[in-house]
Amino acid sequence: MRALIQRVSRAEVTVEGSSIGRIGPGLLVLVCAMRGDPEDAAEKLAARVAKLRIFRDEADKMNRSVQDIGGAVLVVSQFTLAADTRTGNRPGFSSAEAPERGEALYLRFAEALRALGLPVETGAFGADMKVSLVNDGPVTIWMDSADRA
């Protein structure tokens, strides 16, 4: 699974003009299931995201996690994180997981974060969503579950 993680002051996702998920300080996580992801990819990625120390401590160093600050997580599916831009001008997405399994892994990821005690809001898998955010820092981190055994 791939994730683009943004430290935010606030974030919101809307579908057809209606807000379906909103958080204050915390993380906006855009997530994509990749073909061949193992069954435990969602839980492993969730554990890494929950412990990622990208929030400031009293010494102004990035030394706190979203759990440490009592923050929330907004999880939004984004299959375009699987984009292959190596050739041509139109990205390919063949490395993204099939929609049925992709949605299952996306939901497992959100549930795994909840199981770790985090308040979690979600977007709508496969929907045309509008995501607004205030990136704090800015801090944006790329994470791929395949990068770590």
Curated annotation (Swiss-Prot):
**GO terms for molecular function, please?**
D-tyrosyl-tRNA(Tyr) deacylase activity; Gly-tRNA(Ala) deacylase activity; Ser(Gly)-tRNA(Ala) hydrolase activity; tRNA binding
Listed GO CC annotations:
cytoplasm
Protein keywords: Cytoplasm, Hydrolase, RNA-binding, tRNA-binding
Please report, in chain numbering, the residue ranges of the motif Gly-cisPro motif, important for rejection of L-amino acids.
Answer: 137-138
For this protein, the Enzyme Commission number is 3.1.1.96
Report the function annotation for this chain: An aminoacyl-tRNA editing enzyme that deacylates mischarged D-aminoacyl-tRNAs. Also deacylates mischarged glycyl-tRNA(Ala), protecting cells against glycine mischarging by AlaRS. Acts via tRNA-based rather than protein-based catalysis; rejects L-amino acids rather than detecting D-amino acids in the active site. By recycling D-aminoacyl-tRNA to D-amino acids and free tRNA molecules, this enzyme counteracts the toxicity associated with the formation of D-aminoacyl-tRNA entities in vivo and helps enforce protein L-homochirality.
Q: What is known of its domains?
A: A Gly-cisPro motif from one monomer fits into the active site of the other monomer to allow specific chiral rejection of L-amino acids.
Put simply, this protein is called D-aminoacyl-tRNA deacylase
Q: What species does this protein belong to?
A: Paracoccus denitrificans (strain Pd 1222)
